C-alpha cells in the first residue's frame, strides 16, 4: 500500500532501484492482495459524488501488506527472491553501498515496532548475514532511526536509543560488532545525520538539549570523529538550524531562525566559521 496507486481494481506500481555500478537492481514489492478494502466518497467528482475503494490495513487486522524483495542481475538476466522474513508482518528498509553491488544492507522491523535487526544480503545468492538485533520499548523511533553504510560496508553508523537517549554508534559492517559510541558525554538527544566525511572520519549531525542556554527544541549542528572524540558545536547562534553540506564536506549552508527571528542564511566551512552571509 505504500508503493503507488492503492485503488482495488488497479495493479500497484513496483519500484526498482539500481545499484551504483549498474550491475544489479532490486525491487521491494508490497503485496496487498489479502488486505481488506476501505471506502471513501469523492465529493468533488462531476457530475455527482463517486465511491472510491482502496486497500488499507487497519490496526489489529490479520491481513496486512507483505513485502517481497527481489534482486536482478543484468548480465545473467537472473532473479533472486530473497527469503528475508524474520518477524511476522515485518517491514524492511534497504541501504546501498557506495559503489559495488555485492551487498545490500537491510533493517527489519517487526509489526509492533519494538524489535529490529540489522543484516546484509549477499546479492549473488540471496543469503542473509545477521549483524545485530535491538529491542526498544515501547517502540523504535521511526523518524530518527538511521543506518549509514561506510566504505562498502566495512563500517556502519547507527542511531539508537539503547541508553535512553538518541545517540550515534559505530559498528563493524562485516561482523556486527559494536566498535564504539560516537556521541557521548551528557543528557542530550542526537538527531539526524547531516553529512559524513569518510576521508577524515568525521560525522556531522544535529542534536538537541546539549547547550544549557538554548531552547532544547532547537536543532544545533555538531561534528564528532568516528572514534567518539572531538565533539564540536558548529552553529553557535541560539536559534533553530537547518543545514545543507557540499559534496566535498568542506562547506555547508546554514539557515537559522526562530519564531521571533526572521531566517538568516550563511555559508560556513566545516569548522563552523562563517565565510559569508547569503540572506537576511
Predicted regions and their residues:
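Signature of short aromatic-glycine-proline-rich micro-motifs recurring in repeat-based ectodomains
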Residues: 2-20, 68, 93-96, 143-154
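A short beta-strand motif characteristic of beta-propeller blades
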Residues: 3-5, 78-84, 129-138, 177-183, ...
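Conserved hydrophobic/aromatic positions in well-ordered beta-strands
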Residues: 70-72, 119-121, 169, 222-224, ...
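Non-catalytic accessory segments flanking enzyme active sites
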Residues: 26-30, 35-38, 62-68, 91-96, ...
Amino acid at each position: 500500500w505504500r508503493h503507488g496507486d492503492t485503488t482495488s481494481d488497479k495493479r500497484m506500481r513496483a519500484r526498482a532501484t539500481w545499484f551504483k555500478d549498474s550491475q544489479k537492481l532490486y525491487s521491494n514489492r508490497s503485496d496487498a492482495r489479502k488486505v481488506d478494502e476501505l471506502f471513501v466518497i469523492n465529493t468533488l467528482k462531476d457530475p455527482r459524488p463517486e465511491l472510491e475503494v482502496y486497500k488499507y490495513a487497519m490496526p489489529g487486522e490479520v491481513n496486512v501488506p507483505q513485502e517481497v524483495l527481489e534482486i536482478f542481475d543484468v548480465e545473467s538476466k537472473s532473479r533472486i527472491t530473497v527469503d528475508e522474513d524474520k518477524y511476522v508482518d515485518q517491514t524492511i528498509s534497504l541501504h546501498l553501498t557506495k559503489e559495488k553491488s555485492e551487498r545490500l544492507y537491510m533493517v527489519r522491523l517487526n509489526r509492533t515496532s519494538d524489535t529490529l535487526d540489522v543484516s546484509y544480503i549477499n546479492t549473488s545468492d540471496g543469503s542473509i548475514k545477521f549483524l545485530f538485533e535491538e529491542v526498544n520499548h515501547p517502540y523504535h523511533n521511526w523518524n530518527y532511526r538511521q543506518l549509514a553504510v561506510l566504505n562498502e560496508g566495512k563500517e556502519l553508523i547507527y542511531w539508537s536509543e539503547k541508553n535512553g537517549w538518541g545517540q550515534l554508534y559505530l559498528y563493524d559492517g562485516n561482523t556486527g560488532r559494536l566498535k564504539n559510541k560516537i556521541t557521548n558525554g551528557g543528557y542530550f538527544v542526537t538527531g539526524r545525520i547531516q553529512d559524513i566525511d569518510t576521508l577524515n572520519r568525521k560525522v556531522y549531525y544535529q542534536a538537541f538539549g546539549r547547550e544549557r542556554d538554548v531552547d532544547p527544541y532547537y536543532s544545533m549542528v555538531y561534528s564528532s570523529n568516528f572514534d567518539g572524540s572531538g565533539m564540536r558545536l558548529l552553529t553557535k547562534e541560539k536559534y533553530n538550524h537547518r543545514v545543507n553540506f557540499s559534496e566535498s564536506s568542506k562547506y555547508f549552508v546554514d539557515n537559522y531562525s526562530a519564531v521571533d527571528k526572521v531566517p538568516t542564511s550563511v555559508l560556513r566551512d566545516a569548522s563552523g566559521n562563517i565565510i559569508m552571509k547569503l540572506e537576511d
